[in-house]
Amino acid sequence: MTDFELAVSSEMVFTELPIIDRVHRIHDMGFAVEIWSWHDKDLAALAATGARFTSMTGYLHGDLIDPLTCDDVVRTAELSIKAAETLGVSRLNLHTAELVDGHAARPRQRATGEMWLTALRTL
């Protein structure tokens, strides 16, 4: 049998509750917790819940595929690493494009070769 752990996104369930209460409820149900953004949350309060946090967004601004904003991804990833350490998170998610309220800030319908190369250089 393979050991695995199920995690629930605290951003997607029990949305009528404050984030701390969502985390408590998920933890009480026996699941690990995921969060998206961390900059708008009380990290010390989240850590004090005793929940196990498994992943979170690993940057705050910028697009991996945009040469004008890709440096923002790297700069804010450094901040995200420090935040992740507070929660014991070992996995950070990077998306090709910045998210605002869970949606792409600058939606693009098709990736070009130049976009792929920019993402490669950024990473």
Placement of each model-derived feature along the sequence:
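Active-site acidic/histidine proton-transfer and metal-coordination neighborhood
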Residues: D66-L123
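A short, structure-level motif marking secondary-structure boundaries and short turns
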Residues: L6-V8, H27-M29, L64-D66, R108-A111
